[in-house]
Amino acid sequence: RTMCTFLGAGTLIGPDDINDQHIKNHKIAYLEGYLWDNENAKKAMKKMVDICKADNQQIAFTLSDLFCVDRHRDSFRELIENDIDILFANEDEIKAQSQESNFEGAVEYAKSLKMTVAITRAEKGSVVVEKDKVIEINPIQVDKVVDTTGAGDLYAAGLLFGIAREKDISTCGNYASVAAAEIISHYGARPLVKLSNLI
């Protein structure tokens, strides 16, 4: 698969577009690492972080892309260590962010963060690190992997759905796997069935 990321309208978002009341009506804010490439969008996300922290909301962040990590490693590190409660990454991204050469070292880095870190590993499933606990999440088998576009996004949606409903982390991980499995079974990044019917 070859991908060329197009941020579209995301590049037009700035601090003035952030409505305090809309953000305060939610339990978790989800920030996208790709938007770090745009200075105005970065300012908008920093404003969201300030609002969420003042309101004791959880903040989730995805590393987005290996090259994105390479471009922003230091500022990502500062954000993760100071502001983030839930971190999403795939195996390559977490190794790049931690600058560890192997997965085991990257998991130790994730444990050192003392937060929830979800690491996807393609056909190997995923690992969710919750403070110092490491929970292995099995993949959901599909008849045929058709298109992996959107798998990480749907995985994050499933995990956050569970966390927002205060489910245990293994259940949250299973929700994430179910959502990701649905999206890789067909073309396109939108589910063809109602995800709540699958859990």
Segments from the language model and where they lie:
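Conserved phosphate-binding/catalytic region of the ribokinase-like
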Residues: L12-I13, D50-A54, D74, Q99-I199
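Ribokinase/PfkB-type carbohydrate-kinase core domain
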Residues: R1-I135
